[in-house]
A protein has these predicted regions:
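Aromatic-lined carbohydrate-recognition surfaces of secreted/lumenal glycan-active proteins
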Residues: 158-169, 247-262
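Active-site-adjacent "subsite" loops/lids of carbohydrate-active enzymes
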Residues: 88, 142-149, 153-213
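An acidic-aromatic substrate-binding cleft motif
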Residues: 59, 73-122, 126-129
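The substrate-binding groove and active-site-proximal loops of carbohydrate-active enzymes
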Residues: 94-105, 126-142, 184-203, 215, ...
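Active-site beta-loop-alpha junctions enriched in small/polar residues
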Residues: 27, 63-65, 99-103, 128-130, ...
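Conserved, mostly hydrophobic/aromatic
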Residues: 55, 115, 151, 221
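Short, well-ordered coil/turn segments that N-cap beta-strands
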Residues: 92-96, 119-121, 152-158, 214-216, ...
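N-terminal accessory beta-strand-rich subdomains and adjacent acidic, glycine-rich linkers
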Residues: 1-81
């Protein structure tokens, strides 16, 4: 499905849209009480209130089914791999990269030189490095564009780490718990709402950074985990019932933009 989250790293756990129901009309089933889960319904469970503005279009959740013809584990694994290569070919893009915790620009250049010497394909500035993609100042953009150009001259990709969830921003921008009316209750405890002023600005800053520097890889730690938000003042969603859907759409649009931009 294209509506999956919760940080499980496994599609069968992260799938939020697959619901197996019973079918009382299926009277020939083995289960005496007709409770065999055999009727598949696909829908997002926590997105019941999506209002469309004039000229706005709605694109529903999409789920792909793969029919298995064997219990053989290896064959099933090959079938799943082929499905991903066909439906989501970008999942095959796995460059050999070095994770770097840099403290200055020279360490980045040294890592790029090491990658050239050892056959690595990319450098990713990791958590704790001196990279800040949310800094849109001219000085920061110029610095990282210079380093990106250096990497590209040596045919090395350059990327960086960015944390979205599991961080507290402010009462005005964090996810609001429906039970308390206050920030909190998110998947990671506290988390920003992607539909808040901060969340929308974060999206725009990431786009600006990549467009201005030529960076190649975005390592997004704690992407949107499906948090619902009860705020009625965030510009990116109306209220609780559309908050999950709208935040998911914001993240997907950002990922699509990055992929389309190379």
């Amino acid at each position: 499905t294209n509506y999956a989250f919760n940080n499980a790293m496994r599609y069968d756990i992260s799938d939020q849209t697959t619901h197996w129901k019973v079918d009382l009309a299926y009277t020939s089933q083995v289960n005496y009480n007709y409770e065999t889960p055999c009727l598949l319904e696909v829908y997002p469970e926590k997105a019941p209130g999506i209002d469309l503005a004039p000229n706005e279009y709605f694109k529903s959740v999409r789920t792909n089914e793969l029919l298995m013809d064997s219990y053989d584990r290896q064959r099933r694994g090959l079938m799943i791999k082929k499905m991903y290569r066909t439906l989501a070919p970008w999942t095959t893009q796995n460059p050999i990269f070095m994770h770097l915790v840099s403290k200055n620009d020279q360490e980045v250049k040294n890592a790029i030189d090491q990658c050239v010497a050892t056959g690595y394909e990319a450098v990713i500035l990791s958590f704790g490095s001196h990279l800040n993609m949310e800094d849109s100042s001219m000085a920061n953009i110029k610095k990282w564009k210079t380093l990106t150009d250096y990497a590209h001259q040596h045919k090395i990709l350059l990327g960086g780490y960015s944390l979205f969830s599991s961080r507290r921003i402010s009462d005005a921008d964090d996810v609001v718990d429906i039970k308390t009316g206050k920030p909190g209750g998110a998947f990671f405890g506290n988390a920003p709402c992607f539909g808040s002023n901060w969340g929308l600005a974060y999206r725009d800053k990431i786009k600006y950074f990549f467009k201005s520097t030529g960076f190649d890889i975005w390592e997004n730690d704690g992407p949107y985990p499906g948090d619902v938000c009860a705020s009625t003042t965030h510009p990116g969603h109306k209220g609780y019932d559309d908050s999950q859907w709208r935040q998911m759409e914001i993240q997907k649009e950002l990922y699509h933009w990055l992929n389309e931009s190379g």
